[in-house]
Amino acid sequence: MMKKLLLVCSLCLASMAAWADGLQELEKFLREVSSGKAGFSQVVTSPKRATETVARSKTSTGTFEFLRPNRFRFEYTKPFEQTIVADGQMLWLYDVDLNQVTARSQKEVLGSTPAALIAAGTDLKGLSDAFELKPGAAKDGLEWLEAKPKDRNGQLQMVRVGFKQGQLSVLDIEDSLGQRSVLTFNNWQANAPLKAADFKFEPPAGASVMRP
C-alpha cells in the first residue's frame, strides 16, 4: 500500500519547445484549480525477472479527489478495495480485505511525492524546491514534464506528467526498484465543490490500526 502513496497526483505540462508556456500553465493550474476529482486506471509493471519473458503487470481502477491545502483521497475499487486519505494532518491507508488501517503523519511520509504536489501549495516555489524539472518531448498527443526528486534517498525516482489541452491526463511514476506505475485520468472536474469534511477518515469498527 505504501507504494501507492507515491502515486498520488500533480505537476503540469510542457513540451521541449514550449517550456515557458508550460511553466505559465502550471502556475495557472496551481493558482486557479484549488480542488478536483476524477476517475483513474492504474497499471503497475514490475521489472522482468531472469526467468520471465514478459514483465508482470497489474491493473486497478478507482477515483481520486483533492482539496488544497494538503487533502486528497484515492479510492481503489477494482480488483481490490483500498483507500488512501490525507486529511491535512494524517495519512490513512485502509486495506478492506485485511481490515487494517495504517496511520502516519503527513509531514513524515509525503515530502517529494506526486500526491503532495497536487494537493500542497498554490505556487511554483515548493515544486522547484523539491524537484528538478525539465521538459520532455511531446508524445502520444500529450505534452510532458519530467520531475526528479532532489531527495535521492526516497522511493520515488522520477515522475513524468502528461497534459492534454491544459488538463492532467497521465502520471508515469518510477520507483527505486524499477517498478513503473502509470495512472491515466478521466472525467476530470476542476474546482469540484469539495470541503475539508469530505476528507475526514474514521477507522471502521473492528479494524486494526497501526501507527508505525
Where is each model-derived feature located?
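Positively charged n-region of N-terminal signal peptides that target proteins for export
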Residues: M1-L5
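Sec-dependent N-terminal signal peptides
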Residues: L6-L11
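N-terminal signal peptide c-region/cleavage motif recognized by signal peptidases
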Residues: A14-A17
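Flexible, processing/modification-adjacent segments and terminal tails
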Residues: D21-S46, Y94-Q157, R211-P212
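Short linear motifs in intrinsically disordered
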Residues: K28-F29, E65, E81-V85, P135-A137, ...
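N-terminal mature ectodomain segment of secretory-pathway/periplasmic proteins
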Residues: R31-G88
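An acidic-aromatic
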Residues: T63-A115, S181-V182
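Gly/Pro-enriched, hydrophobic low-complexity segments
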Residues: M90, T102, G126-P212
